[in-house]
Regions:
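Catalytic Walker B motif of ABC-type/P-loop ATPase nucleotide-binding domains
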Residues: 153-156
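H-loop/switch region of ABC-family ATPase nucleotide-binding domains
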Residues: 188-189
């Protein structure tokens, strides 16, 4: 479970995040939408313990991040926009390495099972990662998250640069993880697929959460208009 209580972050005189209240429970998907600089990635960095909050608190499964970042981070799986894998290792070797780094010893069959679960083609498992597409790299990153056993997943612009087929496959994997009980917080600019994922859609601007609605409450057209209205009203109020 991810819990944010009046979470705020200031850099000098600039408030990057202001009094964000949010809860993402097991099996739930929360998407954060907004322009660059809205505070979305700052939110992820606060949850990961990479930044210290100016005010408020972030919790991962009841662990306050600021008080024990290492323990809280161990409860999380994070897939950044640019996945960092060892390019000269294969997908299987990367999964093996990062799993062992996390203190887990899994058999080759178990590791291959995770790669199969995320849909990495069997013929690619033994190929070097520098030959992978971005979509294939994302699948390896998700396999690492699965093998880690984390119950909370943070995704930072995971759909950026993916072709439509790869983006749809990635979203299907995210839904499967949520259906399996994971709490998912995803930052994205893709309104269409954010709605398709289900869950909740939070629209942010200038560090504030303007609205947080259920995807089932709106059509794609309505979401587009709500997003534009929020951006217009927030800009006019500044």
């Amino acid at each position: 479970m991810l819990t944010l209580q009046r979470l705020s972050k200031r850099f000098g005189t600039h408030w990057a995040l202001q009094e964000l209240d949010l809860r993402v429970g097991p099996g739930e998907i929360q998407c954060l939408l907004g322009a660059n600089g809205a505070g979305k990635t700052t939110t992820l960095n606060l949850l990961l313990g990479f930044l210290a909050p100016t005010a408020g608190a972030a919790y991962v499964n009841g662990i306050e991040v600021a008080a024990n970042a290492v323990l809280a981070r161990a409860q999380l799986a994070f897939v950044p926009e640019r996945v960092s894998l060892y390019p000269l290792l294969t997908g299987l070797e990367n999964l093996t390495y990062f799993t062992q780094l996390g203190g887990k010893e899994l058999s080759s069959a178990q590791l291959r099972g995770y790669l199969d679960r995320v849909g990495l083609d069997a013929s690619a498992v033994g190929e070097r990662v520098d030959n992978y597409s971005k979509g294939m790299r994302q699948k390896v990153a998700l396999a690492i998250a699965l093998a880690k056993g984390a119950r909370a997943l943070l995704l930072d612009e995971p759909l950026s640069g993916l072709d439509p087929k790869a983006a749809n496959e990635f979203c299907a994997l995210v839904r499967d993880l949520a259906n399996g009980g994971a709490a998912v917080l995803m930052v994205t600019h893709d309104l269409f697929r954010a709605r398709e994922l289900g869950g909740r859609l939070g629209i942010m601007h200038a560090g504030r959460l303007l609205i947080n609605l259920a995807a089932s409450e709106v059509s794609h057209t309505q979401l587009d208009q709500i997003y534009l209205d929020c951006m217009h009203d927030a800009s006019a109020a500044q």
